[in-house]
């Protein structure tokens, strides 16, 4: 399964967090769960389309009762902000018109674009659009990621590579990319290059190392201790083997001690 499923969804709740942070159990039109899911999808599509040149890595959406918070992680924050914040105001006004609520727009800079899989995929797609040979684009992205500190990278291109009449797929890989290890910190990105021969799909996996034991246990404890869940019953089972005999021995030692004084007072 690790070879086929999206690495982000496969590790959701383990090493990855949700990118839509809200809850809805309302039956009112416009506030239902499906309405918010559709609205989140529209927000991401509009932002990816309008800010395509800005190199948007990911968009995180949080909702309150009367406000929507949108966090944009980008490699070029200057393009998103614009001159004197004009572009940011335009984006905010567009989102407020789409959602009908007050929008709080936050812009974060991605400092190391060579280790961001989505930005790497976009970079390769831009080079393919500019008619750079696909092998050269893949090799350059691979070298930049390894120099930036990645422990492994895997790149896949699918389509009419080099203008060939028959579409095919090609892989480039360097280092380790353990897709089935849940504690592995793997970033995944996908983008489509629009060329004169058609669209070419670009997929990128970047392995950044494993989550440490302390970080993993801390994150699991936070999930197991959520209110309304019984996740905390799993880990203590190992300790219950030694706890059971202690509970059985305790009454045997205490029962005679309590019975002896009671008999003496009656006499």
From Swiss-Prot:
rRNA-binding in keyword set: yes
Biological process terms in GO annotation: translation
One MF annotation (Gene Ontology) recorded for this entry: rRNA binding
Keywords, in A-Z order: Ribonucleoprotein, Ribosomal protein, RNA-binding, rRNA-binding
Occurrences of domain KH type-2 (ranges): 43-111
A Pfam family it matches: KH_2
Domain of life: Bacteria
One Gene Ontology cellular component: cytosolic small ribosomal subunit
InterPro entries cross-referenced by the UniProt entry: KH_dom (IPR004087), KH_dom-like_a/b (IPR015946), KH_dom_type_2 (IPR004044), KH_sf_prok-type (IPR009019), Ribosomal_S3_C_sf (IPR036419), Ribosomal_uS3_bac-typ (IPR005704), Ribosomal_uS3_C (IPR001351), Ribosomal_uS3_CS (IPR018280)
Ribonucleoprotein is among the record's keywords: yes
Region of interest (Disordered), ranges: 216-267
Cross-referenced PROSITE patterns: KH_TYPE_2, RIBOSOMAL_S3
Residue ranges, compositional bias (Low complexity): 241-267
Family of the protein in this entry: Belongs to the universal ribosomal protein uS3 family.
Annotated function: Binds the lower part of the 30S subunit head. Binds mRNA in the 70S ribosome, positioning it for translation.
Self-association and partners: Part of the 30S ribosomal subunit. Forms a tight complex with proteins S10 and S14.
Name under which the protein is recorded: Small ribosomal subunit protein uS3
Species name: Bifidobacterium longum subsp. infantis (strain ATCC 15697 / DSM 20088 / JCM 1222 / NCTC 11817 / S12)
């Amino acid at each position: 399964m690790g070879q086929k499923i999206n690495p982000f969804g496969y590790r959701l709740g383990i090493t990855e967090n949700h990118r839509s942070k809200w809850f809805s159990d309302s039956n009112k039109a416009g506030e239902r769960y499906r309405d918010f899911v559709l609205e989140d999808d529209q927000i991401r599509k509009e932002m990816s389309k309008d800010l395509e040149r800005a190199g948007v890595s990911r968009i995180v959406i949080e909702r309150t009762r009367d406000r929507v918070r949108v966090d944009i992680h980008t490699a070029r924050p200057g393009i998103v902000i614009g001159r004197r914040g004009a572009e940011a105001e335009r984006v905010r006004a567009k989102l407020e018109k789409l959602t009908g609520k007050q929008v709080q727009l936050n812009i974060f800079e991605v400092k190391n674009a060579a280790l961001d899989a989505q930005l790497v995929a976009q970079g390769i797609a831009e080079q393919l659009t500019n008619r750079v040979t696909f092998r050269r684009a893949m090799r350059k992205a691979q070298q930049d990621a390894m120099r930036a500190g990645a422990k492994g990278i895997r790149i896949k291109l699918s389509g009419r590579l080099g203008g060939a009449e028959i579409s095919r797929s090609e892989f480039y890989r360097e280092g380790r990319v353990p897709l089935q290890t849940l504690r592995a910190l793997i970033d995944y990105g996908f983008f489509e290059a629009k060329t004169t021969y058609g669209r070419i799909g670009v997929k990128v996996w970047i392995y950044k190392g494993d989550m440490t034991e302390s970080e993993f246990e801390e994150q699991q404890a936070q999930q197991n201790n959520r209110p309304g869940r019984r996740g905390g019953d799993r880990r203590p089972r190992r300790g219950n083997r030694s706890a059971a005999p202690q509970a059985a021995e305790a009454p045997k030692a205490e029962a005679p001690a309590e019975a002896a004084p009671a008999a003496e007072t009656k006499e």
